[in-house]
Amino acid sequence: MGKRIQLVLNQDVYKLGRNGDLVEVAPGYARNYLLPKAMAYVATPGVLKQAERRREQERQRQLELKQAAEKQKQVLEGVGTLTIAMPVGEKEALFGSVTAQDVADLIQSATGQEIDRRTLTLPEVRKLGTYTAEIKLHTEVTAAVKITVVAE
């Protein structure tokens, strides 16, 4: 196998790596594709230090986001069971259903914390009872909140 060149990627490159990754590629691939399209630049000692510093800053930022999500999880799970009143028909069947937006509004009124409805995972709620809503706060942090549906 011939000589290979070390490059730092400027952007995500399919089947090669992500932005900021240090990769080794064939000289022709670097010279004819990656470098002319500004997808990567040659890895000099200064560039390697800068890329490492950037990776460390990103790691620190992710750690701070995870810690903030852990705190938010403690607040949400410390609330206990939230109650929502819905109009009911025969056999305890609801008129309509409880939506993720309803739960997000309920959580905001109870805790003061704004929750995006797209982060909520809610089972289908069409009858009275207690349900568990899961809130994805971070890629590694999920909070569970109990919701009780009662007759209006």
Swiss-Prot record:
SUPFAM superfamilies for this protein: L9 N-domain-like (SSF55658), Ribosomal protein L9 C-domain (SSF55653)
Alphabetical UniProt keywords: Ribonucleoprotein, Ribosomal protein, RNA-binding, rRNA-binding
Keyword hit for RNA-binding: yes
Alphabetical GO biological process terms: translation
GO cellular component, one term: ribosome
S-adenosyl-L-methionine among keywords: no
GO terms, molecular function: rRNA binding; structural constituent of ribosome
Pfam families in the cross-refs: Ribosomal_L9_C, Ribosomal_L9_N
Family as reported in the entry's similarity comment: Belongs to the bacterial ribosomal protein bL9 family.
Its biological purpose: Binds to the 23S rRNA.
Full protein name: Large ribosomal subunit protein bL9
